[in-house]
Amino acid sequence: SNKYRMRQGTLLAVSMLLFCIFLLSGCGKLPEGMLKQEKELYTQGQIRMIAATERNRYQNLYTGQLWSVTADGQGNTFESLLKSQIGQFLEELAVVDRMADEQGIQLTSQDEDDINNLAEEYLAYMQVSKDEVLDLYRKYYRADKTVSQMTESKNLEVSDAEAKVIQVERIETDSREKAEELLLQASEEKSDFTSIEEKNSLNSQIKFQLEWGPDLKEPDRSAFALEADEISDIIEKDGRFYIQKCVNAYDQQATALRKERLAQKKKTEAFQKIYLPYQEKYRVRLDGDVWENIDFSAGEGCNSDNFFSLYHSYFSK
């Protein structure tokens, strides 16, 4: 089926990957077309859904004591910073939802059926109305769909060469004479390169996973010229001498993951060029009162952290 999706991750990662926009700033006169602050933008139940998901995701990993901890140099607590991130996400979601209206991007009957099933499952975890869950998932899905449709004409392809990941083993020494001696040993028939490097390398790390990039420095750059099981010549860099052996000239799994990551980055950058001018015209602010009943230090009986993970289980590749 023709399904759209965002990359799985934290709320901040979702916000950055989908929108790549920092918290909207500035006060004073509202620009023409700007959405006014209003409590009705989201219900308290919808805000609790996102807040509970993020609160519990962190608390399930760490501890409930973290909310009062000072998290930056300005004296903000971890709770206040996370609320700011949640607010940013909800504001951006509202902007892209309005963009979808103007672009005529709507949900199909199949989309509605999928989202209805998703909402029914989520209701088992949260004490909110079905309408609140449906509305929030619709906004989230349509924002996802808007990003996909508005970037589908862009060149987002990433080549295997661009995403290439390799595995190497490396000997590092501070003497050319020593390096020449070790290269002779490593070049002998049936020599054990791993054993030689473990005994002689000055760096305790001997295995490296390298990602190709145009700005690679030595000795990383030379490693990409090696074939599988090939041993390099001596490479000198900043008074150190390196000998490398290519263990895997094309790490298929790691390359595929990186290719997906780079494609998502291109997609984010392409959408950002569309989103930023639009966001300047239609800004959104949540009313400050929406946080009055949201207390991260309370709610120990609720451990739901799956608003986003459940979404991705429905709308994945």
Task: Label each region the model flagged.
Residues 2-13:
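Bacterial N-terminal signal peptides that target proteins for export
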Residues 23-26:
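C-terminal motif of bacterial Sec signal peptides marking the signal peptidase cleavage site
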Residues 28-132:
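N-terminal targeting/tethering segments
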Residues 37, 127-174, 178, 217-317:
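PPIase-associated folding chaperone regions across multiple families
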Residues 52-56, 87-106, 117-128, 138-156, ...:
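Sec-exported extracytoplasmic/periplasmic mature domains
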Residues 107-111, 161-166, 171, 188, ...:
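Extended intrinsically disordered, low-complexity coil regions enriched in Ser, Thr, Gly, Ala
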Residues 110-121, 202, 210-214, 292:
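Short linear loop/turn motifs
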Residues 182-220, 248, 252:
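Peptidyl-prolyl cis-trans isomerase
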